[in-house]
Amino acid sequence: MDKNFYKNSLNIFNSNFSMKANLSEKDKFYADFWEKNQIYQQILRKRRGNPRFILHDGPPYANGDIHIGHALNKILKDIIVRYKTMAGFYSPFVPGWDTHGLPIENKIINQIGSKSTLEIRRKSNDFANSQILAQMKQFKKLNLLTDFKQIYQTNTPNYEAKQLKLFKKMVSRGLVYRALKPVYWSPSSQSALAEAEIEYLEYRSPSLFTSFDIKKGNNFVAENDKLIIWTTTPWTLIANSGVAVGENFDYVRIKNGENFYVLAANLLEKLAVIFDWKHYEIIDNFPGRAILGIKYLHPIFEKICPIVSGNHVSLDVGSGLVHLAPLFGEDDYWIGRENNLEMVMHVNDDGKFNENAGQFSGQFYADSNKLITEFLEKKSKILHLSFIDHSFPHDWRTLKPVIYRGTPQWFVSIEKIKKDLEKAIEEIEFPENWLKKRLTKMVVERKDWLISRQRSWGIPLIIFYDQNKDPVLDKPEIFDYIISLVEKFGSRIWYEKTTDELLPEKYQNLGWTKENDILDVWFDSGVSFFAANISDEKPPFDIYFEGSDQYRGWFNSSLINSVIYFGFSPYKKLLSHGFVVDAKGNKMSKSRGNGVDPLLILSKYGCDIFRLWVANSEYYNDIVYSEAIFEQNVEIYRKIRNTVRFLITNLADFKPTKYELTEVDLYIFNKIQKLKNEIIQNYDQNRFVRVVKIINNFIIEFSNFYLSIVKDILYADKKESLKRRQVQYNLYELLQVLNIAIAPIMPTTAEEIYSFIQKNNKQISVHMEEFFKESHFDEELDAKWNEFFQIKDSVYQLIEQKIKSKEIKRPNEVGVLLKTDSDFIKSIDLKKLLMVAKVEFSNGKTEILQLNWEKCPRCWNHFEKINKVCARCFEVLSEIVPEKNS
């Protein structure tokens, strides 16, 4: 008989489950399949009465294409939702979009110029809606388990009305107030900014030591003595109205040359080096309180200002004497109020100086540093000038520097609700305790929330001013009336109608006016727990999951708003992920030139490999993107796919039936139960990288050991042999486990695999299946087999030596003389497990026996003597030869 006859007699099947994935084609095919069959909707109907699990989607900003961070975020959420859904929970996933704010407004203004507020708002609204549609189309390519017809967006009348209901609640609780305070001000945006809208970037500032002349002295200082002042913002010297000292700090009056100077004693040596003072003389020592009330001459204008006490004075840097410009610094402001200092505002909204700047009026604040320095130089008031590079606040949208600037603004008091916030944080589950501390620091230690913005595209602050220009906050019926109008017409009504048209009849024609400011956009997204319609579900929701920057953003505003409205956190658990960085650890972005388009990645690799990269990342840290890392995930995917293909192919003739297992088959079945348990535990902990690693490691071990030893049974035994069916039962068990296990991560591949699985009560989609439950794992059985693997390792070391010396080609050519006293080892089929020709037991050392036995041409195993083929193959062939000859 020829070789082809033997080959054709083996149990070798073909499969339509291809080795090549063709993911790009299959992504579209299965996405269409899921949409056509309304799989998401069917899942929700099926799970409707089950326990709920709600992951609330934080809304991305509706501007521009999605970036790799968007894709990472949505996929991580989708993995959780898919797993929870398969685990039996009712878990609707409702995507949202944040639509108001400066980027869109600026884009529209650049397109149409400075038109009316109504026109800017109309165009901004249209643009935001178009961007939602564009981003939605891109998000669909990520194979998310959701219905993009059921979304929420912050510019709908219903959402806006609910947002204003929450604002009304804040007002009714006495939390909203208006005050003149220095706040972050962005000249580039011409608006106030909250802390959440600040990004710290490197910036070069002047480091200037100048002097102020004392006008009238006392027992410690004299007229014309010079106060040494340090500043990095010379432009604020125009608004100077006082100098602060530390009451209990020690100060010195020193003489250098012809001049007398005053500075902190602890900083004298340091400054003497900077000023190159070689021969100074200490004239007197005194505490800071000794010169309180002393007057000095303003460095620029002809006016007199006082020395006052300041708790913020530090001896770390500077001179121990701090220049105060009360409308340009928070500490300055409070000290100015306490001491009735003059409040000078010389900077307009656009950052240019007004008439209060005298000869410098019309200058942009940053450009004036040079001019003011030159002015002081001419008056011989500069002791030292250098430049420092330091971290400086910038507008997170325009990336331009911001300043502290005193303007009348609206605030929400955080001080009044701090205890409530602390209590709410205690109820939140965090994966790590340091994350709890981070949120606490961001929320509880923050200043009062600045909620007003001087822009057009946003939700209006629905506040009226009476004829005396006082805000009307004590008329709830006015708020209710406006909210009803917004619910019907949208927030545009505030700008379309006159003040009287917006008021209930009894408050009309009283000479009232309306507020022009809008609410902080973080207020918009921060009410989504209440304003978004998530399948009629109410907070607290199970998880909020966003980038780590949201501790000061969405996590923060959502918590504050929910505590004010409901009295509890809107989320039970908080998860966060890092940023996507390149191979060098640099954050990826278009502006840095290292950004990567996720749509191009999807086109090249397919969605499942992209999702595998996400799952296989330690997302709680920054996530590295590189071609090399993607190729590693391609290799993992290939291993999974090839293993699945082997399983499917070798189950072609298997009908799902349970078989009693023994020996190694029982050991492997037990291992599969452990695999199931570990997968469940890590999905429950949202440790997807561990899920991937566990699956990958199992496949490697399974292939290297079990598949190696059972291929002979699968291919060469009778089709219906019990041994073969026992092996197939394990293959079937593993195939089902892998299919379900990868479904949350790789939905396309899981769906394709499912189409090849035979089972009773099969669903229309794998994603409608139930996730497997935890199973009993026999630790004693598992431990018992450790003894075998120790023997296997030692035997194979000896066999490898024979192969390296070219005495043999394969392990199945040799015999093993094995030293062992173990009853367990003697009870198992070592010939099969070690894949050798024979095994004998010995009292001496373990040896490899070189045999010159005959090779069976059908199964390629070696035997002492065969009659054309081995006995097993002869028995198989004796049944199929008549079939071949018929």
From Swiss-Prot:
Q: Which residues bind L-isoleucyl-5'-AMP?
A: E546
Name the needed cofactors. Zn(2+)
An example molecular function term from Gene Ontology annotations: zinc ion binding
Q: What organism is recorded for this protein? A: Mesomycoplasma hyopneumoniae (strain J / ATCC 25934 / NCTC 10110)
**Reaction(s) the record says it catalyses:** tRNA(Ile) + L-isoleucine + ATP = L-isoleucyl-tRNA(Ile) + AMP + diphosphate
User: At which positions is ATP bound?
Assistant: K590
EC number annotated for this UniProt entry: 6.1.1.5
Q: What is its main location?
A: cytoplasm
Q: Which UniProt keywords apply?
A: Aminoacyl-tRNA synthetase, ATP-binding, Cytoplasm, Ligase, Metal-binding, Nucleotide-binding, Protein biosynthesis, Zinc
Q: What is this protein called?
A: Isoleucine--tRNA ligase
Where is the protein localized? Cytoplasm
Q: How is the cofactor bound?
A: Binds 1 zinc ion per subunit.
